[in-house]
Amino acid sequence: MVQLAPAAAMDEVTFRSDTVLSDVHLYTPNHRHLMVRLNSVGQPVFLSQFKLLWSQDSWTDSGAKGGSHRDVHTKEPPSAETGSTGSPPGSGHGNEGFSLQAGTDTTGQEVAEAQLDEDGDLDVVRRPRAASDSNPAGPLRDKVHPMILAQEEDDVLGEEAQGSPHDIIRIEHTMATPLEDVGKQVWRGALLLADYILFRQDLFRGCTALELGAGTGLASIIAATMARTVYCTDVGADLLSMCQRNIALNSHLAATGGGIVRVKELDWLKDDLCTDPKVPFSWSQEEISDLYDHTTILFAAEVFYDDDLTDAVFKTLSRLAHRLKNACTAILSVEKRLNFTLRHLDVTCEAYDHFRSCLHALEQLADGKLRFVVEPVEASFPQLLVYERLQQLELWKIIAEPVT
């Protein structure tokens, strides 16, 4: 479904009316996508890297040695409270005007007069070009060290990439795909969920977790840095094989925390897990026992784009929650996508609206065994991955508790 231009432009994606491309890949320059192979169905597979905005020391302190999530020191952009000029706090060069000096008590009228010359024209006080000027005409320019929240244009993929191994997540993925293959791409909801997992290390550390609709496996890779075991599940041998390759590419991350990632098939439209040993990525009886005996966390990212599949996801969540021996928490990420529809002649969010109705139905479920508590998660936690955190990106938490 992806058409490639010949020769030098072979990594340029040609859009078709029946393909979908994630914004994560759309806004990434072409030269950062390294085409590595063709998958079993003939789709080009690309390799991209995602940089974690933390230092090696922070990783060691917070992850490998069991620190709390508050120990993770991130690189944060300048605060919006420092004024539109971007001046650091305390510099005295905010929105007050360059002619004002710290500690001077002046009125607005005096400020206006100070900025006019003898002819009544505006006299703009300019900062010197460099702090080394011997006779500056005004206050010296403060040294500012900007924080760049993006990869450099000359980024190199592969072993030559700069940074420690714990700073980089390498993911194989496809580009523009039909709707049924969107799991082969990386979506913003997976990056938001990964940020939350890194923030709530106390929730994930030492647990057994299961991801539904894992796709490329990015969220499972992050979870494995803290969890004891992560069951990374989806359907389709080709997708699961690519997911397995991504687990191997990032095995050093899971090894730091001692976690294990098991890639397995889990079909939401079936009640039972596949145990046929002849089927790739099937379940053993030992794995099924471990899943039901120890799992306390379920999570899923960006799997709510089709109403029938959304219904299947919630049925699977309910079924798993009833079979687990322990109370569990489910973390779901979703992007509220706005579309203009001819049927309504208005901007609607039908897939999101159906997702919310399913949340409400689950919360109202009363079978005498489990009680489901649904609550939104405020996306105010630190951002450790480079992506655009839109207002339309949401996290929801579902707590399944036994009825007492």
UniProtKB/Swiss-Prot annotation:
Against InterPro entries, the record matches this protein to: Methyltransf_16, METTL22, SAM-dependent_MTases_sf
Q: Where is the composition biased (Low complexity)?
A: 79-88
Q: Which catalysed reactions does the entry list for this protein? A: L-lysyl-[protein] + 3 S-adenosyl-L-methionine = N(6),N(6),N(6)-trimethyl-L-lysyl-[protein] + 3 S-adenosyl-L-homocysteine + 3 H(+)
Chain spans, region Disordered: 60-102, 115-145
Q: What is its main location?
A: nucleus
Q: Might you report a single GO cellular component term? A: nucleoplasm
Give the Basic and acidic residues compositional bias ranges.
68-78
Subcellular localization is given as: Nucleus
Q: Under which main EC class is this enzyme filed?
A: transferase
Instruction: Extract the Pfam families matched here.
Output: Methyltransf_16
Keywords of the record:
Methyltransferase, Nucleus, Phosphoprotein, S-adenosyl-L-methionine, Transferase
What are the GO BP annotations of this UniProt entry? Answer: protein methylation
Highest taxon listed in the record's lineage? Eukaryota
Q: Tell me where in this chain the PTM Phosphoserine is found.
A: 132
**Annotated GO MF terms:** heat shock protein binding; protein methyltransferase activity; protein-lysine N-methyltransferase activity
**EC number(s) per entry:** 2.1.1.-
Assembly information from the UniProt record = Interacts with members of the heat shock protein 90 and 70 families; these proteins probably are methylation substrates.
By sequence similarity, the record places it as follows: Belongs to the methyltransferase superfamily. METTL22 family.
Protein function? Protein N-lysine methyltransferase.
Q: Name the chain's protein.
A: Methyltransferase-like protein 22
